[in-house]
C-alpha cells in the first residue's frame, strides 16, 4: 500500500511540477499586467467621411457614479501621449486646488497609422507649398492638409457621441492641443469658432506652410466682424530662434514665441466683441516640456475653483 501511495505521490508531484513549469512559461510569455487608469474607458469610432477608424479615450470624474450632474468636457488632441497627462493634472487640480471636475475625451491617432503620419494629415490645414517632407510610414507617401475634414468629423460624429453616452455639459466644451494639435484648434477657431467654448493652444506650429495660418486669420477678419471664443495661448520661453539665425516662417528658422505674439496681436487688433485671448510665456520651458504648464494655466483660465 505504501508503495502504491509513493508511486501515486511521485506521479502527482511530476504532474504538479509540469503544471508549474507550464504556468511559469505562460507568465513569462504574457509578462506582468499593464497599468490601468481608474474610471477610464475606450470607445471605437468610425469616421465615415474619412473612411478611417479612431478611438476615444474617456476619463470620468470620481463623482460621476454618485449623481446626475453634468460636467465640462475636455477634448484632447494627440491623446496617445496627452490623455494620461490631462486626466491626471485635471484630477489633481480638483483634489488639491478645488477646480471643478471634468470629463476628459482623448482623440487617438487613426488605427493602423504611425502617430506622426496621422497627426500630419489630420491636424494640418494645408499641403506645404515650399517644404518637402519624408515619409514616416513604409510604402505610404506623406499626407497633409486634412484638418478641415477631421474637424468636421469631430463636430458631426465625436461631439454627438459624447453627448449621447455621457453626462457632459456640451455648453462647456474645451479643446486642448499642442504643436500640430494647436494648428487643428486654430483651424476650427477660424472656421467654426463655436465648436468649443474654450481653446487651450500650446506652442502652435505657426511656421507651418510658410505661415498659412496668418493668411487664414487675415481672410477670416475680412469676412467677419466677430470671433466668439475664449482662447488661452501658452508657449515655452525657450522656443525662440537660436542666436545668429535669420528668422523665417520655416521649421528650422522659426521664432515660435514671436510668431505667437504676432498672431495673438493680429486677433486683438480686430477688437472682436466676443473674443477673449490670453497669452502666457513659460520662460524656462521648451517645446517638449511646456505642455503641462500650458494645460494647468489654460484650465484655470476657464474652469471655476473653490480655492
Each model region followed by its residue ranges:
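Alpha/beta-hydrolase fold nucleophile elbow
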Residues: 167-178, 199
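Serine-hydrolase catalytic machinery in alpha/beta-hydrolase-like enzymes
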Residues: 69-153, 157, 161, 165
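The feature captures the conserved acid-bearing segment of alpha/beta-hydrolase catalytic domains
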Residues: 207-276, 281
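Conserved hydrolase catalytic core segment
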Residues: 187-197
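A conserved short beta-strand
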Residues: 100, 195-205, 230
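A domain-start/cap signature at the N-terminus of enzymes
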Residues: 26-72
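Gly/Ala-rich beta-loop-alpha elbow adjacent to hydrolase catalytic centers
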Residues: 177-181, 185
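Bacterial N-terminal signal peptides
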Residues: 13-24
Amino acid at each position: 500500500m505504501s508503495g502504491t501511495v509513493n508511486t501515486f505521490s511521485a506521479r502527482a508531484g511530476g504532474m504538479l511540477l509540469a503544471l508549474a513549469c507550464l504556468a511559469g512559461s505562460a507568465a513569462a510569455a504574457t509578462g506582468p499586467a499593464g497599468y490601468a487608469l481608474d474610471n477610464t474607458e475606450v470607445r471605437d469610432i468610425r469616421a465615415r467621411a474619412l473612411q478611417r477608424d479612431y478611438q476615444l479615450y474617456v476619463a470620468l470624474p470620481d463623482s460621476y457614479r454618485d449623481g446626475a450632474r453634468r460636467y465640462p468636457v475636455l477634448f484632447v488632441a494627440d491623446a496617445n501621449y496627452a490623455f494620461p497627462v490631462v486626466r491626471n493634472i485635471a484630477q489633481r487640480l480638483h483634489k488639491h486646488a478645488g477646480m471643478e471636475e471634468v470629463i476628459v475625451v482623448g482623440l487617438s491617432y487613426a488605427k493602423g497609422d504611425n502617430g506622426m503620419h496621422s497627426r500630419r494629415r489630420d491636424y494640418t490645414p494645408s499641403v506645404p507649398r515650399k517644404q518637402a517632407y519624408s515619409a514616416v510610414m513604409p510604402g505610404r507617401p506623406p499626407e497633409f492638409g486634412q484638418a478641415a475634414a477631421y474637424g468636421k468629423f469631430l463636430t458631426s460624429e465625436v461631439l454627438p457621441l459624447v453627448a449621447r453616452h455621457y453626462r457632459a455639459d456640451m455648453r462647456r466644451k474645451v479643446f486642448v492641443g499642442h504643436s500640430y494639435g494647436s494648428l487643428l484648434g486654430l483651424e476650427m477657431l477660424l472656421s467654426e469658432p463655436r465648436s468649443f467654448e474654450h481653446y487651450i493652444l500650446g506652442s502652435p506650429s505657426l511656421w507651418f506652410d510658410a505661415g498659412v495660418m496668418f493668411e487664414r486669420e487675415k481672410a477670416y477678419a475680412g469676412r467677419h466682424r466677430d470671433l466668439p471664443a475664449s482662447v488661452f495661448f501658452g508657449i515655452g520661453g525657450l522656443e525662440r530662434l537660436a542666436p545668429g539665425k535669420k528668422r523665417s516662417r520655416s521649421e528650422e528658422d522659426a521664432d515660435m514665441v514671436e510668431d505667437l505674439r504676432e498672431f495673438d496681436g493680429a486677433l486683438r487688433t480686430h477688437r472682436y466683441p466676443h473674443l477673449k485671448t490670453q497669452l502666457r510665456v513659460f520662460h524656462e520651458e521648451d517645446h517638449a516640456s511646456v505642455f503641462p504648464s500650458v494645460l494647468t494655466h489654460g484650465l484655470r483660465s476657464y474652469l471655476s475653483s473653490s480655492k
